[in-house]
Amino acid sequence: GKSEEELAEFFRIFDKNADGYIDAEELAEIIRSSGEHVTDEEIEELMKDGDK
């Protein structure tokens, strides 16, 4: 698992349009760049969880 600090760092790097939000495409890129394999369905679940 990643620490919250690592995730925050990822967020800053991948929030390309700097709007404070990461879209599904950006999130998929983050996760895949960390070496994890993730499906589009998993990304959708993460996006739903992240909206809370």
From Swiss-Prot:
Keywords: Calcium, Metal-binding, Muscle protein, Repeat
Residues annotated as domain EF-hand: 2-37, 38-52
Positions of Ca(2+) binding: D15, N17, D19, Y21, E26
GO terms, molecular function: calcium ion binding
Cellular component terms per the entry's GO annotation: myosin II complex
UniProt xrefs under CDD domains: EFh
Sequence similarity: Belongs to the troponin C family.
Remarks, miscellaneous: Skeletal muscle troponin C binds four calcium ions.
Physiological role: Troponin is the central regulatory protein of striated muscle contraction. Tn consists of three components: Tn-I which is the inhibitor of actomyosin ATPase, Tn-T which contains the binding site for tropomyosin and Tn-C. The binding of calcium to Tn-C abolishes the inhibitory action of Tn on actin filaments.
Protein name: Troponin C, skeletal muscle
Record organism: Protopterus dolloi (Slender lungfish)
